[in-house]
């Protein structure tokens, strides 16, 4: 099952230029890629201009000498419904804040604010609780590293006890 997401840019008029992404919408997927690869207004604008996505990749443009279409796409390259699949009416849309929260059945919503920081919300569980994406990913990494350290300690203790 897909983890769907909306990707948006806060506009000066108070609205949000928004596209849909069908796959890997969780913070360690789409969130991490947005934070590391689409961290400037210019890069995000280029992404939004592609319209709705099947897959968000680290790169926008495919190698023109290789196939890049649905079920045969280039790894780490964004797969856009309009450009790569041939679907119609997939362009970015402008939403008010209220409409953004109700725009789709997305699991997560990511917004690059006017201040240049990525924020996100779990639209299914807490749609009005926004978190700083960078801080949240850092916390998840630290928690994961701590858990791995605990597992290594348990494994070492188990080896010591069995000797």
Where are these regions (language model features)?
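Residues that act as N-cap/strand-start positions at coil-to-secondary-structure junctions
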Residues: 1-3, 104
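Extracellular/luminal recognition modules and glycoprotein regions
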Residues: 3, 25-34
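Short beta-strand scaffold segments in enzyme catalytic cores
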Residues: 4-9
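Short acidic-glycine loop/turn motifs at beta-strand connectors
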Residues: 10-15, 112-116
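Aromatic side chains
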Residues: 16, 20, 108-110
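Short, solvent-exposed aromatic-acidic interface loops
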Residues: 18-29, 126
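Low-complexity intrinsically disordered segments
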Residues: 37-152
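Non-Sec secretion/translocation targeting segments of pathogen effectors
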Residues: 153-163
């Amino acid at each position: 099952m897909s983890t769907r997401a909306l990707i948006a840019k806060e506009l000066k008029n108070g609205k949000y230029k928004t596209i849909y992404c069908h796959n890997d919408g969780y913070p360690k997927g789409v969130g991490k890629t947005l934070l590391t690869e689409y961290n400037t207004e210019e890069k995000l604008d280029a992404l939004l201009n592609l319209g709705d996505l099947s897959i968000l990749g680290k790169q926008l443009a495919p190698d023109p000498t290789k196939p890049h279409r649905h079920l045969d796409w280039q790894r780490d390259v964004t797969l856009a419904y309009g450009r790569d699949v041939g679907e119609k009416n997939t362009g970015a849309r402008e939403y008010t804040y209220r409409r953004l929260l109700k725009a789709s059945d997305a699991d997560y919503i990511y917004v690059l604010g006017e201040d240049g920081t990525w924020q996100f919300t779990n639209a299914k569980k807490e749609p009005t609780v926004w978190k700083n994406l960078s801080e949240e990913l850092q916390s998840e990494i630290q928690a994961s590293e701590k858990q791995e350290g605990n597992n290594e300690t348990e494994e070492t203790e188990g080896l010591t006890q069995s000797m």
